[in-house]
């Protein structure tokens, strides 16, 4: 058997048996075999966590732990920990097991809970203590040792959910994501986090009651600094011990699944923390990072970029994705900072980067890595979704790899977010001059499969909270928030909302304290806002017109996109059932319009089914309680006209009444409209 591979931009045919020779090992054990090592060094072992790191096993009739580590340029490696009083001992020296940098040792009689690190002697004579890159649990910060874990299994009861997930077409399903930071959603007190187990009691119930379909956890990989929010990782396989243990997180996810709530994990495969105990210069030389200093150094975030072309790094990262999918039943990955991975010149000035072999700024190995990641997940984990946080106009992010795409399922629509936030920050007087801020996103809407995000990044660093971005006094801010959200839920694309926005928290998000839940109890308007979001979420979930044809051009139609003078937008959302559609009338000024004509596509009886101006939401109560009757006559290029009342700073949603065996005359007789 032979393989064809690219080497120095030339095709080279090399027999597999010769390539395997350098990975050969004489070490006999139950944890890995030569095929495992071969695939690992080829960048195609997607379950490397099954043999890398620390694994309880029996060898020569002795129970203990086998440790396996990749450190290609280390001189010597010792395992140190509680069991050795943190001293290097000859009997705890790892053996180099092949030519390509794998080291391993079996140590008998080790027990769960023991803390350990690798003492790595470097070629220059220096030594450093490193946590286990594949370690699955760690000390609570500021301590940094890895911890042996054996009993990590739970009794899952989410088989029904997993079966449903595998059969679901998520492009034609409702996806409404609640993004949250576990350490600051709720707390016991100012200095004590809720544990995974404590969260499993209250979080699923809250998410279900509010009508969200998914939660998205900000990174739960181990990280030393709370203020990094989890985005500067030292332990990719180690779930953060801030909130409890491995079984606790599994129980939390299981509890969410039992309530039919999907779980998405924020994941950072592009760059890593430079703290000494982590992956940084692991064996004294660039190991997980690029060899070239300019390429490795991420000055913007003070981190190092992964060398995504290195096979062992690819095995490490793709296996990490499957570790959370397989072991924790994660339903999706939101891949952070994809733009940083795709572009060689991302965050770099002229002269600070080197073009690729074709003279471009594309990071070719990163592109290949992303494609392989998405292909692998689609192949081996049907129903698990991947989401790109990608902020540029890179094409085909959500197209299949076989057609030249990156293979993501969804992409955050950062353009929509920026334009619509800028619009809603304007005084309504000036909105007519920026009318296209809300219409332009539809010009490129079908270029990708978008998610509309209002994320944590928009409510920090002086940007103000979502409610505080809105223009006007207290009442108008809340009215504007309701209108903006209803417009968002009517716009094509799946939805994402950061915690705290759902009740109008005025202060920016702070990772060191819990949300201002007291607002709901103390202030009637915030309680009403909270109820509004609950109703809006369920309205979205229960009406297929709002999600079934998100990525089909037939799912959206403008009725009036050009009324800039009144800052009114009117559009239709459709479903596969041609008789079902919803008409959205969005008014972004505080003016009420009576006897306002809109065009509708069909003759019939219409009804207002949702109105953000309801008194129960804190609005002025300009609602329509009865039936409305269209009449023949062109309006907005539609054959029929409907006369309505348009509430101030609000969104109204209408539908045509379809009732079997009921004529229009009968509906007229029963009409109670006043």
Swiss-Prot record:
Gene name of the encoded protein: glgB1
Gene3D superfamilies reported in the protein's UniProt record: Glycosidases, Golgi alpha-mannosidase II, Immunoglobulins
Free-text function comment from the UniProt entry: Catalyzes the formation of the alpha-1,6-glucosidic linkages in glycogen by scission of a 1,4-alpha-linked oligosaccharide from growing alpha-1,4-glucan chains and the subsequent attachment of the oligosaccharide to the alpha-1,6 position.
Quaternary assembly: Monomer.
GO biological process: glycogen biosynthetic process
Protein name in the entry: 1,4-alpha-glucan branching enzyme GlgB 1
Record-linked SUPFAM superfamilies: (Trans)glycosidases, E set domains, Glycosyl hydrolase domain
Record GO cellular component, one term: cytosol
Catalytic activity as recorded in UniProt: Transfers a segment of a (1->4)-alpha-D-glucan chain to a primary hydroxy group in a similar glucan chain
Pfam families: Alpha-amylase, Alpha-amylase_C, CBM_48
């Amino acid at each position: 058997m032979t393989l064809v591979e690219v080497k120095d931009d030339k095709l080279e045919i090399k027999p597999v048996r010769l390539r395997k020779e350098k990975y050969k090992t004489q070490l006999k054990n139950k944890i890995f075999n030569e095929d495992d090592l071969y695939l690992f060094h080829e960048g195609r072992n997607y379950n490397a966590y099954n043999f890398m790191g620390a694994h309880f096993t029996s060898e020569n009739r002795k129970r203990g732990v086998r440790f396996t580590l990749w450190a290609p340029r280390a001189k010597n490696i010792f395992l140190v920990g509680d069991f050795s009083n943190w001293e290097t001992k000859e009997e705890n020296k790892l053996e180099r097991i092949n030519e390509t940098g794998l080291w391993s040792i079996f140590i008998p009689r080790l027990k769960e809970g023991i803390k350990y690190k690798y003492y790595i002697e470097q070629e220059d004579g220096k030594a450093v203590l490193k946590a286990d890159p594949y370690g699955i649990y760690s000390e609570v910060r500021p301590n940094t040792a890895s911890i042996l874990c054996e009993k990590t299994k739970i009794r899952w009861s989410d088989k029904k959910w997993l079966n449903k997930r595998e059969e679901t077409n998520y492009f034609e399903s409702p996806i409404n994501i609640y993004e949250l930071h576990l350490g600051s959603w709720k707390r016991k007190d100012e200095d004590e986090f809720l544990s995974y187990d404590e969260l499993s009691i209250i979080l699923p119930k809250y998410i279900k009651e509010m009508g969200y379909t998914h939660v998205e956890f900000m990174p739960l990989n181990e990280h030393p600094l709370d203020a990094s929010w989890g985005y500067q990782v030292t332990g990719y396989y180690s779930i953060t011990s801030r909130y409890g243990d491995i079984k606790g997180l599994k129980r939390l996810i299981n509890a969410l699944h039992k309530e039919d709530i999907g779980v998405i994990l924020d994941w950072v495969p592009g760059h890593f923390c430079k703290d000494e105990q982590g992956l940084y210069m692991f064996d004294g030389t660039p190991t997980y990072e690029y060899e070239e200093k300019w390429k490795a150094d991420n000055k913007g975030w003070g981190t190092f970029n992964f060398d995504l072309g290195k096979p062992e790094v690819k095995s490490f990262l793709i296996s990490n994705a499957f570790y959370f999918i397989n072991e924790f039943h994660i339903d999706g990955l939101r891949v952070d900072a994809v733009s940083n991975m795709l572009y060689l010149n991302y965050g770099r000035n002229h002269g600070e980067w080197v073009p690729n072999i074709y003279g471009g700024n594309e990071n070719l190995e990163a592109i290949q890595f992303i494609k392989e990641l998405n292909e692998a997940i689609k192949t081996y984990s049907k129903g698990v979704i991947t989401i790109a946080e990608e902020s540029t106009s890179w094409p085909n992010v959500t197209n299949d790899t076989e057609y030249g795409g990156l293979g993501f399922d969804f992409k955050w629509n950062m353009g929509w977010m920026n334009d619509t936030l800028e619009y809603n920050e304007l005084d309504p007087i000036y909105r007519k001059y920026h009318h296209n801020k809300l219409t332009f996103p539809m010009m490129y809407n079908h270029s990708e499969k978008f998610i509309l995000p209002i994320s944590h990044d928009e409510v920090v660093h002086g940007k103000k909270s979502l409610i505080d971005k809105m223009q006007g006094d207290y009442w108008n801010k809340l009215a504007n928030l309701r209108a903006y959200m209803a417009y968002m839920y009517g716009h094509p694309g799946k939805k994402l909302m950061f915690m705290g926005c759902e009740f109008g928290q005025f202060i920016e998000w702070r990772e060191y304290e819990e949300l201002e839940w007291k607002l709901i109890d103390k202030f009637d308007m915030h309680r009403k806002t909270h109820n509004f979001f609950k109703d809006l979420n369920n309205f979205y979930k229960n009406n297929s017109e709002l999600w079934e044809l998100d990525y089909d051009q037939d799912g959206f139609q403008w009725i009036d996109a050009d009324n800039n003078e009144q800052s009114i937008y009117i559009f239709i959302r459709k479903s596969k059932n041609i008789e079902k559609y919803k008409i959205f009338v969005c008014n972004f000024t505080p003016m009420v319009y009576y006897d306002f004509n809109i065009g509708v596509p069909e003759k019939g009886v219409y009804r207002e089914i949702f109105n953000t101006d309801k008194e129960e939401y804190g609005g002025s109560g300009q609602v329509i309680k009865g039936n409305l009757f269209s009449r023949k006559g062109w309006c907005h290029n539609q054959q029929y006209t409907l006369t309505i009342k348009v509430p101030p700073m609000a969104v109204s949603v209408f539908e045509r009444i379809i009732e079997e065996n009921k004529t229009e005359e009968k509906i007229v007789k029963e009409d109670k409209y006043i």
